[in-house]
């Protein structure tokens, strides 16, 4: 058993004998069921630094979204010396460390693909280095090049037509959460020793492919840990030893995260479940008189300020999929332990309070792990912050805990992952609505008129017959699932080979659990289309070649989103059927196949490439996002809509079921107290049914319209809204995506 003087006052034994942060937390945290009255406002230092950062953000927006970009230096742990928000204010920064040498400057990260790194530069008027072009074209292979070299014609066609899209073949896959708490608890030197033990015990001497690969990966992880020490030394910090107080705990943890974002540009670079862990250090310092509540809040404010600054260089096609510059620095608060104790601490309040001290913001992606059993005071405070900022999402701790335990993190938008025990292979999503059109047209793409799917017999009748459509759809779905898994197997293999996440994996157990994440787009439109075919009459409109290009619906039909089992059960069937088709395939590194109903803002892109559907949706218009009902389908109010989504079993979509709802403030009540109580009741009722996720927006459409027309108004500079799985500054969305948000249902009544 190891022991450090920095651990004085901490209880427990197992976490001292092995890397086990959960055991440390369970033995040492202090649950809090009081209210928010203890919270402190922003310090003078916080106001000055946040003011300087807001000025930079304003300059960034004026320059078209990018303040500065690197063109000559390849990002790495030690590529840069120290950087600060403002050199003249650097002594005020309680938490230090930037991705590059300047605030909001975007790093050059070519290992995912040199073409992408260069295109990101030229898009914003920067000239990339000719020398780096030569190195990463002639001498070094990148992930992107390797993937496209290996793609089959069928894979390229599916990608081109957007029946599969958003694939991590032009950017880092992300969704891997290093257990950044380990840096604070153990220090780097101890973590290196643990990894060296793993290396010594890797294999039995027989050099199989798996053993060779794992030995190389562990060696790279050890190298990354050593690099983290050097990175921290540039800021005058020695992270070789455990953190001795709250400030060091916050700083050491942040250095672990900084290592990840300096070396990877994944679509989701989550922070993880850190609030209760850090509260242990803060509580110890408060009790021994070395920290005040104001200083504690300042630490959290400054840490969150750093998370708000994370930036990556992106290409236009990426921004169409994931609009508004998100990084998914997802950070969780709340939850209930396996022993039944609330895991709400004062620090959970402090993280939510950053939205009051520094105003609303999309990052970090603050996530409440919700249960109706959480302390009432905390539920009301979270509801209050939601109502005032629209910056918080909620996920059901009661359905996730049996699968992932009580120390999981959210690794992107809505996907759970065991912190420090697991990694996820991110896999974007398949267009199940377009797949229905392929079934009707025998694999011919309705937009390009080319044979992109298998040449099955098309449906030629004037009216669609449910008993004919369904088996053809199942057949086409099975083809799509098989192709989808093959594409992802190829991508994940190449990512491990050419863009391995050693800094993150160094902070995860060597014997790692792997999940294989897939996703569904167009979910509600498939439900309503099949319902229309089954319960109404759907006439096919064909072009001169006989291709189905439109549909006329005669009569009414039940729609998903109205608590009508006739429609909702189609959704349950669709989810289970697709998951079973995915799970029967071989997955890379024997990972566990999961799926999600989640689109991010790619619902707009998917819609652009998908023709008219039998539910009445017009050709090439946006899909409804995530698991949301189709636009205009919800006729019975918010609660009926929530009830429909809640029927989808989480255990068939362990990668997450995203639901985003907008509520007019008047629908929740006429006073702050009434609104808080009503929102808590909505959340309790929704999650007690087994629902997984809810984004909560509280505003009227009038505000959105005014923000779209007058983005220059000061009140809209940080106006944040929740979209499918994340938050975004509304004025950072494209006009098209703003219109899509405005077209969604805004519930005027519960």
Model-derived features: positions:
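Conserved catalytic cores of very large enzyme subunits
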Residues: 2-750
